[in-house]
Curated annotation (Swiss-Prot):
Protein name per its UniProtKB record: Indole-3-glycerol phosphate synthase
Organism expressing this protein natively: Geobacillus sp. (strain WCH70)
UniProt keywords, alphabetically: Amino-acid biosynthesis, Aromatic amino acid biosynthesis, Decarboxylase, Lyase, Tryptophan biosynthesis
Family matches, as NCBIfam families: PRK00278.2-2, PRK00278.2-4
Gene encoding the protein: trpC
Enzymatic class: lyase
PANTHER family: INDOLE-3-GLYCEROL-PHOSPHATE SYNTHASE, TRYPTOPHAN BIOSYNTHESIS PROTEIN
Record-stated family: Belongs to the TrpC family.
GO molecular function, one term: indole-3-glycerol-phosphate synthase activity
Signal peptide from the UniProt entry: none
Length: 258
C-alpha cells in the first residue's frame, strides 16, 4: 500500500501548483511543545476524516471545530491529514486550522519532494512528517535540512529498528516518531514502540504513533519511554472529541491546572 501511495504522490507532484502564502503566520515549535507538555506525556491530536485501512472514520467532519475542541482539551499540538486521495484530507483544512488555534500544526502527508516543503510553508504548517520507510535515508536528510532551512520542524517517523539505524548513520532527528502500524500491511502493535525505543538517542523527543485508543494503551507506551503520543482514529470516532481526550488520560493524569 505504501508503494501505491508514493506512486500516486509522485504523479500529483508533477502537476502541483503552489498557493499564495498564508499571511501573518506565527510559527510555533512542535518540539518545544512536546518537551513541556500539558500532561506527563505529550499529545498530538489528529484531524483525520478517513484512512486507506479503515475507510471513512468521521462522516460528520468539521476540521476547525475538531481542532478547537482538541485545543480546549489540552492537546499540545495538532496533526492534520492533507492527503486527498487516500485520507480525504485537504491543504485547506490545515490553513483553516492554523488560523483558528494557537497550537503547533503538523502536516501529515507523504512528503517526498522539496516542492511539498515550500507548499507546507505556504499553507501554514509548523512541522511536517517525513516517513523513514518511504524515503532513502540520504533523501530524507536532504528534505529534513530543507524544511529546517525554511523554518519548519520535522517529525521523522520509523517503523523498524533498521530504518532508524540507517537514518542515525547520517543524522539525529530532533523528533522521532515510532509508528506502531506497518504501512505495508497496516498491522498495528504497540510492541513496535518497545522494540524500537531502546535505539533512539536520548536527546530526541520520542512520539509513539498509531494504535493508541485507551488509557491503558497510553500508559503502556509511556512505560516504554515515549515522550508523546499521536492519536487520531480513536478520538475521531467519538462524537465529543474533547471528552474523548479527557477519557484517554483518565488513568494517567488529569490536565495540569492553575
Amino acid at each position: 500500500m505504501l508503494e501505491q501511495i508514493i506512486a500516486t504522490k509522485k504523479k500529483e507532484i508533477e502537476t502541483l501548483t503552489l498557493s499564495k502564502p498564508l499571511q501573518n503566520v506565527q510559527r510555533r515549535s512542535l518540539s518545544a511543545a512536546l518537551k513541556k507538555p500539558n500532561r506527563s506525556i505529550g499529545l498530538i491530536a489528529e484531524v483525520k476524516k478517513a484512512s486507506p485501512s479503515k475507510g471513512l472514520i468521521r462522516p460528520d467532519f468539521h476540521p476547525v471545530a475538531i481542532a478547537k475542541a482538541y485545543e480546549k482539551a489540552g492537546a499540545d499540538a495538532i496533526s492534520v491529514l492533507t492527503d486527498e486521495r487516500y485520507f480525504q484530507g485537504h491543504r485547506g483544512y490545515l490553513s483553516d486550522i492554523k488560523q483558528a488555534v494557537q497550537l503547533p500544526i503538523l502536516r501529515k502527508d507523504f512528503i517526498i519532494d522539496r516542492i511539498q516543503i515550500e507548499e507546507s510553508v505556504r499553507i501554514g504548517a509548523d512541522a511536517i512528517l517525513l516517513i523513514g520507510e518511504a524515503l532513502p535515508a540520504k533523501t530524507l536528510y536532504e528534505l529534513y535540512q530543507e524544511a529546517y532551512d525554511k523554518g519548519l520542524e520535522c517529525l521523522v517517523e520509523v517503523h523498524q529498528r533498521e530504518t532508524l539505524e540507517n537514518i542515525l548513520d547520517i543524522f539525529t532527528p530532533e523528533i522521532i516518531g515510532i509508528n506502531n502500524r506497518d504501512l505495508h500491511t497496516f498491522v498495528t502493535s504497540l510492541e513496535t514502540t518497545s522494540k524500537v525505543i531502546p535505539f533512539v538517542p536520548s536527546g530526541s523527543v520520542i512520539v509513539s504513533e498509531s494504535g493508541i485508543s485507551t488509557s491503558h494503551d497510553l500508559k503502556t507506551v509511556q512505560t516504554y519511554g515515549a515522550d508523546a503520543v499521536l492519536v487520531g482514529e480513536s478520538l475521531m470516532r467519538k462524537d465529543d472529541v474533547e471528552a474523548a481526550i479527557y477519557e484517554l488520560f483518565r488513568e494517567v493524569e488529569s490536565i495540569a491546572g492553575p
